[in-house]
Design a protein with these regions (language model features):
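Acidic, low-complexity intrinsically disordered regions
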Residues: 1-194
Length: 194
C-alpha cells in the first residue's frame, strides 16, 4: 500500500497598507524571489493562497492554487495604501480555510493593528488556538516593530520575528527556507540570521 503524502498548503497574508510604501520595492523583489525558489523546488507540489490587505479591502488574490501558477508582484498589482485592519484580515482568512488541515499560515506586516471592525484579538486567538490544536496548522508572524510583537503575542502566535524593512530580501529568504522545511518535513523553523 502506497502512503499518500499530505498536501502542503501555504497561506500568505501580506500587508498592503500605506506604511509598506517605504519598502514597496524590497517587498516586491523579496516576494518574487521567494516565489521563484518555491516554484523551482523539487518534490511535492505546493498549494498556495495569497491575501493582501488594507483598510480599503482584503483581496484574496490566489486561493489554493498550485504555486507554479502564481504571478509575480509588481508596481501595478502591489499598491500600498490605507490603514491596518490586521485582526479582520487574519480572522477572515483563517475562516476562508476553516476545514483545511496542516496549513502553514504566514503573516507579514510592518505595522500593528489599528483598524479592525469585525474581529478583536481574543477572537483571533481562539481561531488560532483551534487551528493549531485540532487541525495541525502552523503560524509564522513577521512584524517590523515592537507593537507588532505585542500583536503576535496577544493572539498566541509563538513563532514571531522582527522584520528589518531595510532588508526585506533577507526576510523573504528566511520565509522561503521555512516553507521549504514545511514542504520537506511538515514542520517549520525560522532562523533569524542577524
Amino acid at each position: 500500500m502506497i502512503k499518500k503524502k499530505k498536501e502542503n498548503h501555504v497561506v500568505f497574508l501580506l500587508d498592503q497598507t500605506g506604511s509598506m510604501e517605504s519598502c514597496k520595492g524590497d517587498t516586491i523583489g523579496g516576494f518574487n524571489n521567494f516565489l521563484k525558489e518555491q516554484k523551482e523546488k523539487k518534490g511535492d507540489s505546493l498549494k498556495f493562497s495569497l491575501t493582501l490587505f488594507n483598510s480599503a479591502k482584503v483581496e484574496k488574490r490566489y486561493v489554493g492554487i498550485d504555486i507554479k501558477k502564481v504571478k509575480k508582484l509588481d508596481d501595478k498589482n502591489y499598491i500600498p495604501s490605507n490603514l491596518t485592519p490586521l485582526w479582520d484580515a487574519v480572522g477572515n482568512t483563517i475562516q476562508e480555510f476553516a476545514k483545511d488541515k496542516d496549513v502553514f499560515f504566514i503573516i507579514l506586516t510592518d505595522g500593528y493593528e489599528n483598524f479592525s471592525k469585525e474581529f478583536k484579538a481574543a477572537a483571533v486567538k481562539r481561531l488560532i488556538t483551534d487551528k493549531e490544536k485540532n487541525f495541525g496548522w502552523k503560524f509564522l508572524y513577521l512584524g517590523a516593530d515592537v507593537g507588532s510583537f505585542h500583536d503576535a503575542q496577544s493572539v498566541g502566535i509563538g513563532l514571531h520575528f522582527k522584520v528589518d524593512k531595510s532588508n526585506m530580501g533577507e526576510t523573504y529568504a528566511c520565509v522561503s527556507q521555512s516553507v521549504s522545511d514545511y514542504r520537506d518535513t511538515g514542520d517549520i523553523k525560522y532562523e533569524d540570521k542577524k
